[in-house]
């Protein structure tokens, strides 16, 4: 009986020592992962290694649970039961810590992806806005050019009408002088009426030219808008 207890206890001791050694390694891995997290670093290989260690400890804990039940002495059996439970609890605690770390890491990766997507969309929208601004700038430039052309055309029209008015005044003065000369030399009334008719025709031509100029300016304004 004693030999059985020693053999059982020895077997449990070996398994327990292996479990404690792997737990220590897993705990150190968790601490390293948390340090990496605080420095914004990631180590997927280390996380996978810690996960494998915890799985191995769970397997050893299952073996320990079978072994302590075979110990005939109650006091020894209770002792190894508590040790087995402690190993299992520590393995579960480390597994929970690892899951929390992986959850935080996954959330950070998702947030980083969302930020990248937002920046990408913002960049695309920015380019679209710049394109709109360019089109608006081109439209404003076209309006300014049209306005300048209209002002130049209006100024040219005014200058032409002014010159035409000056010519009309000079023509009237010349006509009056010619009539005076004709009256002096005694031309017939038919000749005088012919001259007056020509004056009326010139007056109609003058007003027709003014109206045509105004119509052209109006049509140009409508075309440029």
Curated annotation (Swiss-Prot):
Keywords, in A-Z order: Acetylation, Golgi apparatus, Membrane, Protein transport, Transmembrane, Transmembrane helix, Transport
Keyword Protein transport: yes
Residues in the Cytoplasmic compartment per record: 2-200
Cellular component GO terms held in the UniProt record: Golgi membrane
Chief location bin: Golgi
GO molecular function: SNAP receptor activity
Keyword RNA-binding recorded: no
Protein topology in the membrane: Single-pass type IV membrane protein
InterPro entries hit by this protein: GOSR2/Membrin/Bos1
Vesicular side: 222-225
Family from the record: Belongs to the GOSR2 family.
Function: Involved in transport of proteins from the cis/medial-Golgi to the trans-Golgi network.
Name the record gives this protein: Membrin-11
Source lineage: Eukaryota, Viridiplantae, Streptophyta, Embryophyta, Tracheophyta
């Amino acid at each position: 009986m004693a030999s059985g207890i020693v053999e059982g206890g020895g077997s449990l001791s070996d398994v327990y020592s292996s479990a404690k050694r792997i737990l220590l390694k897993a705990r150190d891995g968790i601490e390293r992962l948390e340090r990496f997290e605080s420095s914004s670093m990631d180590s997927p290989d280390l996380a996978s290694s810690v996960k494998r260690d915890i799985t191995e400890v769970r397997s050893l804990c299952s073996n320990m649970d079978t072994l302590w039940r075979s110990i005939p002495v109650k006091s020894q059996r209770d002792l190894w039961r508590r040790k087995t439970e402690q190993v299992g609890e520590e393995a579960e605690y480390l597994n929970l810590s690892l899951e929390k770390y992986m959850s935080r890491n996954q959330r950070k990766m998702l947030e980083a992806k969302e930020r990248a997507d937002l920046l990408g969309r913002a960049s695309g929208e920015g380019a679209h806005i710049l394109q709109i601004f360019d089109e608006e700038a081109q439209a404003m430039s076209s309006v300014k050019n049209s306005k300048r052309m209209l002002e130049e055309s209006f100024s040219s029209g005014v200058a032409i009408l002014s010159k035409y008015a000056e010519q009309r005044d000079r023509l009237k003065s010349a006509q009056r002088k010619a009539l005076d000369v004709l009256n002096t030399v005694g031309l017939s009334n038919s000749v005088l009426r012919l001259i007056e008719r020509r004056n009326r025709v010139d007056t109609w031509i003058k007003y027709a030219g003014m109206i045509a100029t105004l119509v052209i300016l109006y049509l140009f304004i409508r075309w440029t808008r």
